[in-house]
């Protein structure tokens, strides 16, 4: 009996574990009152500025500079009932001929891999929102 309980716990933790290539974090919040406000506060806590696009179920941020590498990331939160789905994109700045960094022309999805700065920001927002996290592609 104990073995079955241990196997059940291990299997559930493996299902919700981060895998290389994951691009989304889905958070299920127990209490969905003021969930929009919670997500906004989580973004602001990590120095993101919210873009006001008048969409009641989606929050998007302006690009934010990474602290260690020359690049930017932009995050999006889609809110539906008590679920929040976080995704993001990043772009690396280019060094021009005069030694100045230029804004990225292309952005790519933030994916999970060891040492991903964008994923750390995405997960930081998810942890501030609270609730049960699940990771997917």
Q: Each predicted region: which residue ranges?
A:
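Sec-dependent N-terminal signal peptides
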Residues: 3-15
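Ser/Thr-rich, low-complexity intrinsically disordered terminal regions
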Residues: 18-137
């Amino acid at each position: 009996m104990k073995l079955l309980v241990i196997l059940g716990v291990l299997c559930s933790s493996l299902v919700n574990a981060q895998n290389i290539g994951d691009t989304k974090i889905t958070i299920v919040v127990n209490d969905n009152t003021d969930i929009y406000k919670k997500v906004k506060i989580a973004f602001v806590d990590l120095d993101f500025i919210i873009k006001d696009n008048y969409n009641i179920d989606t929050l998007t941020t302006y690009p934010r500079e990474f602290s260690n590498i020359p690049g930017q990331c932009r995050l999006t939160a889609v809110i539906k009932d008590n679920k929040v789905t976080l995704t993001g994109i990043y772009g690396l700045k280019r060094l021009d001929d005069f030694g100045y960094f230029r804004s990225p022309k292309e952005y790519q999805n933030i994916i999970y891999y060891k040492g991903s700065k964008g994923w750390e920001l995405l997960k930081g927002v998810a942890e501030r929102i609270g609730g049960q996290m699940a990771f997917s592609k």
